[in-house]
Design a protein with these regions (language model features):
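Active-site and adjacent substrate-binding regions of carbohydrate-active enzymes
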Residues: 1-623
Length: 623
């Protein structure tokens, strides 16, 4: 028996039954037929996988916690806005490496429909890179260049829908029943109206409702997001097999992490919101198990921006514990950072984190402060009430504060998707503009500029210091501001999220790296330093959760990381005021002295109290 045969035999022995059971939970009597199809796809993918990628697989099998290591630091960018093309991005690998990046998420790479395309998420061809970015060969070359520098490439895969121009949709329109079965198509409004009774609207402003009449197809098509994005039917096993083949094609071109976009929506059940149904997790486990056989060095990241109780299943709950996605976004951490920054009060933050369910220890959070999307104020009424707040009133306050309407606000953001029925207002804006740098620079007041820079560096330090993989959004490391020229572009003018999707300012990046006293330089130098400190601390391993230490002062957030090699306590001042902290709080967890990792100083904790400067962060490590 050859080594290849032995490798596959051992992996099937380990994962074959799990794969079969996951498929059975969804496809029932069709399981054996589907399993045989899936095995053929797996075997073909394994044969086509390069020796270099197979070596990566073997290395990852020896270090299964590779995604949880302290040195894992993420960066998120649009290829065209960061470097023009995939080839152009190869020339920027040094920049990423110098910052400390080891995980690069490139926003939609695959060929979208030619017109309005939801920022690239209306994919027309999953097996072709956007022509303006390059080719699949360019993608492979970039992945290899990144891999040689220890940087894992992350790519999006939209699972819930395809563009109306996709080959499957075109064949469905032409009347081919095989492909009509790939979608949710109805001859009249009878079933759509029944489903609509329980479905929310994703884009109420410009895409109301969840179904669109298609004249060519002579059917009502399920279109959760936009009329040009057709929801696919995962109850059809042929759809599962199609997507598994797509995943392996990306992995065999060097992608190491697949971001499962809109994963929550892929299973439809009448009488529900059609989000997060149990079959979603069976399907994810089946996909993950399949890649464990042919490409075990790869991982899944769930794009599920939901509440805490709804989020845990995407990392694994019950029978799926630790067997679905490897990483998920900690949206609540991001929202609570912005909330506490506006209110100067961390009590709601404490309550929300304390109530957060524990994740499987082999999974990882993605922590972030900004991303390509808007900010939705995902603060539950229950968490707000527990803190003595009204949920609707607090969410309204945050929208007013970060759109600059609230008196005394330092922020400059834009309201996105106002829903008059729910009074929901989301916010667009860059980190620097929302944190006050834009207004401060306009005023030219040194004190306000200093406070804004302190806010930005504190927020970034909190993200780098939290559990999991910190995800830095392109340009935030140099304090890029809102880009209002989006309104001059007909393709972007109707979507103000483009205000925080600027073209990377490489002149500003060069200035920031050369002049650490400039505003951009202060942010870059501080972030680079914090990342370096993080890499040196075993306490930052993502298997360890950050837990709340009750703070005696509402301005301060105190987090404990209880690692086998010792304890770490992080303290963040989320206000512009000098704030005192009783040393007794620290002594209870660290003893009589501790090393502060960010400054490198030893602290005597037998004093009465410590004072934190405005927006200061302290990372204490027990001796």
């Amino acid at each position: 028996m050859t080594r290849v045969d032995t490798t596959l035999r051992l992996r099937y022995a380990r994962y074959g039954e799990e794969l079969r059971n996951s498929l059975h939970a969804v496809y029932g009597d069709e399981t054996e037929r589907v399993y045989d199809l899936v095995v053929r796809i797996i075997n073909r993918a394994y044969r086509e996988r390069s020796a270099d990628l197979k070596a990566l697989d073997e290395a990852r099998l020896l270090q299964p916690d590779w995604l949880q290591l302290p040195e894992r630091v993420g960066y998120v960018a649009y290829t065209d806005r960061f470097a023009g093309t995939l080839k152009g991005l190869e020339a920027r690998v040094d920049y990423l490496s110098d910052l400390g990046v080891t995980y690069l998420h490139l926003m939609p790479l695959l060929e979208p429909r030619p017109d309005e395309n939801d920022g690239g998420y209306a994919v027309m061809n999953y097996n072709k890179v956007r022509s303006d970015l390059g080719t699949m060969e360019d993608l492979s070359n970039l992945a290899a260049a990144l891999r040689s520098r220890g940087i894992a490439l992350v790519a999006d895969l939209v699972l819930n829908h395809v563009a109306a121009e996709h080959e499957w949709a075109q064949k469905a329109r032409a009347g081919e029943q095989h492909y009509r079965d790939y979608f949710w198509m109805f001859p009249d409004r009878t079933m759509p109206d029944k489903y609509e009774q329980h479905l929310p609207e994703i884009f109420p402003d410009f895409a109301p409702g969840n179904f669109t009449w298609d004249e060519q197809a002579k059917a009502w098509v399920w279109t959760t997001f936009n009329s040009y994005q057709w929801d696919v039917n995962w109850s059809n096993p042929n759809v599962f097999c199609e997507y598994l083949s797509i995943i392996f094609n990306l992995l065999n071109h060097g992608v190491e992490v697949i971001r499962l976009d809109a994963i929550a929506f892929i299973w439809k059940r009448l009488g529900t919101m059609c989000q997060g149904e149990e079959e979603v997790h069976h399907l994810t486990q089946a996909l993950r198990t399949a890649i464990r056989i042919a490409a075990p060095g790869a991982a899944f990241k769930a794009e599920a921006i939901v509440g805490p109780e709804q989020l845990l299943p995407y990392l694994g709950k019950g029978e799926h514990w630790g067997k679905v996605s490897d990483l998920a976004y900690h949206n609540s951490f991001m929202v609570q950072l912005w909330s506490s920054l506006a209110s100067r009060d961390t009590r709601l933050f404490e309550n929300a984190l304390r109530a957060f369910p524990a994740k499987p220890s082999n999974t990882t959070w993605g922590a972030y402060i900004r991303c390509h999307d808007d900010i939705g104020w995902a603060i539950s009424d229950a968490d707000a009430a527990h803190t003595g707040l009204s949920g609707p009133e607090h969410r309204r306050f945050l929208s007013q504060f970060y759109s600059g309407i609230y008196p005394g606000s330092f922020a400059r953001g834009l309201v996105f998707q106002y829903n008059p029925v729910t009074d929901d207002r989301r916010i667009s804006g860059s980190l620097a503009s929302l944190a006050g740098l834009e207004i401060a620079l306009e005023k030219g007041e040194a004190d306000e500029i200093d406070l804004a820079l302190r806010r930005i560096t504190m927020l970034l330090t909190a993200v780098v210091g939290f559990s999991g993989v910190p995800l830095l959004y392109m340009g935030d490391e140099i304090g890029m501001l809102n880009d209002y020229t989006y309104a001059d572009d007909p393709d972007h003018a109707a979507d103000n999220r483009w205000v925080h999707r600027p073209v990377m300012d490489w002149d500003a990046a060069d200035r920031a790296r050369k002049d650490p006293s400039s505003p951009g330089g202060r942010i870059y130098a501080a972030l680079q330093h914090v990342i370096g400190v993080r890499r040196s601390l075993p306490h930052m391993h993502a298997s360890i959760e950050s837990t709340v230490v009750p703070s005696p002062h509402q301005h301060l957030l105190i987090l404990l990381r209880d690692h086998p090699q010792g304890r770490m306590v992080q303290v963040y001042n989320l206000s512009e005021h000098r704030t005192s902290l009783s040393a007794e709080v620290l002594r209870a967890h660290l003893g009589h002295s501790a090393w502060e990792a960010l400054s490198g100083y030893d602290y005597n904790l037998d004093v009465h109290e410590l004072t934190l400067e405005p927006y200061q962060a302290l990372w204490f490590v027990a001796h």
